[in-house]
Amino acid sequence: MKLFTCRWLPSSEPKGLIFLCHGYGMECSIFMKDYEGHGKSSGLQGYIKDFDALVTDCSEHFTGICERKENSKKLRFIMGESMGGAVVLLLHRKKPAFWDGAILLAPMCKIADDVKPNQFVISALTKLTRIIPTWKIIPTPDIVDLAFREPAVRKEVRDSPYCYKGRPRLQTAYQLLTISLDIEKRLQEVSLPFLLLHGGDDKVTDPSVSKLLHEKAISSDKTFKLYPGMWHSLSRGETAENTEIVFSDITKWLDEKTATGNAKLERELKSGNDALHTDSSGKTILVE
């Protein structure tokens, strides 16, 4: 199995590391990776056999980068949109104290009722999942039309060979439904600092559950912003003016977190150095 990864590095020393988790059917185009069956990674396009395995792939890749010598002292942030938001929450659940903060854009804490089939259909399709898991027969509206507000962006997504546009495969839909139900039941376990953004007119993931996440999470540092009139894809599918608002809020939040986080790190390093003393021979000794 080959998984496509990419990174963007600034010319100057970065304040911290940001890891991006893309949404269902999308690709990575900072540090990022395409999930199995997505973008430029290998595997059946649009097929998620095991969501836990997908999260483990991300965890191992991101953790490996964080633990490199040149990155070991840098702040670590994860950012995810839609299904990527669910990946972010599960990465946090895997290692609750590892990440310094998260940015969640319309996270998949619950699939909106407008997209989800009725319970009778779900029960029937769940049984079929064991027999024909890769079949594309889930009766859902066109997600591209629901997610992206701008017609030009919809065309761009439809024209990309790396973005999956077909109906959800049975096993994929089952995995997404199962994971979203699990996350919805365990919102109170979220403990890291986070910025949570959601469009008020989102028809793909439920804005009311994002509000519930903000209320239930035990995080002492949490911010929720609901953008009236905006759709599901906040990072790519909105008007230029709306996209500017969203990324301005993200940049402001990151600047605040890196400023306080790096100041704390400097104090810790200074405290450690204060305990060291150089003797007459030039050797550094620890002062008890």
Can you annotate each of these PLM segments?
Residues 1-9:
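A short loop-to-beta-strand scaffold at the N-terminal edge of the catalytic core in hydrolase folds
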Residues 9-38, 42:
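Short, surface-exposed "cap/lid" segments of acyl-processing enzymes
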Residues 38-74, 240-245:
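Catalytic nucleophile-loop/oxyanion-hole region of alpha/beta-hydrolase
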Residues 81-168, 172:
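Alpha/beta-hydrolase-fold enzymes
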Residues 190, 196-198, 202:
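Short beta-strand/loop motif that positions the catalytic acidic residue
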Residues 192, 206-215:
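Short alpha-helix in the alpha/beta-hydrolase fold that links the catalytic acid
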Residues 211, 215-233:
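Catalytic histidine neighborhood in serine/cysteine hydrolases
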Residues 228-288:
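Catalytic active-site module of serine/aspartate enzymes centered on a nucleophile-bearing elbow/loop
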